């Protein structure tokens, strides 16, 4: 079974950190938009999720862990700081990184342009 989605046909998440929520609430600080492209609800996959996140200037993701998921990121454009466990390091266009299951991680945008990342999570046994 084939599952093809296009970002241009998707709506971003609308949680409290999203651009749409903050504009609607007239909040001045915009953090990020996330699009969940492929997931276990819209595809036959039982283990994989793929998404696209834009973190706007001065924005960040909410720090979190995935106890049953490992995650990889690819930085499409921009620059920022990634915190994975106890480590903190700079990321930029072209970087790929891995986050093991159960490890805290968060991302901060640091440049003049939005930080855009593609991410994939996979369920572990």
Where do the protein language model's features map onto the residues?
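A short hydrophobic beta-strand segment most commonly corresponding to one strand
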Residues: 53, 98, 113-125
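Short, conserved beta-strand element in jelly-roll/cupin
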Residues: 53-57, 65-82
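Short beta-strand His + acidic residue motifs that chelate non-heme Fe in jelly-roll/DSBH
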Residues: 62-64, 82-83, 99, 105-112
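Short strand-connecting beta-turns/loops that link adjacent beta-strands
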Residues: 42-43, 68, 112-113
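Short, charged/polar surface micro-motifs in flexible loops or helix N-caps
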Residues: 43-46, 55-60, 79, 123
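Short acidic-glycine-tyrosine-enriched beta hairpin
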Residues: 86-101
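A short, N-terminal "cap"/entry segment at the start of jelly-roll beta-barrel domains
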Residues: 1-48, 62
């Amino acid at each position: 079974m084939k599952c093809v989605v296009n970002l241009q046909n998707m709506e971003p998440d609308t949680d409290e950190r999203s651009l749409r929520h903050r504009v609607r609430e007239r909040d001045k600080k915009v953090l990020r938009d996330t699009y969940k492209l492929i997931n276990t609800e819209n595809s036959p996959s039982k283990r994989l999720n793929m998404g696209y996140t834009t973190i706007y200037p001065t924005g960040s993701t909410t720090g979190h862990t995935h106890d049953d998921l490992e995650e990889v990121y690819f930085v499409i454009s921009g620059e920022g700081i990634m915190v994975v466990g106890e480590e903190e390091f700079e990321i930029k266009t072209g970087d790929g990184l891995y986050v093991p299951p159960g490890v805290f991680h968060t991302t901060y945008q640091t440049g003049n342009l939005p930080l855009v990342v593609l991410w994939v999570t996979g369920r572990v046994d």
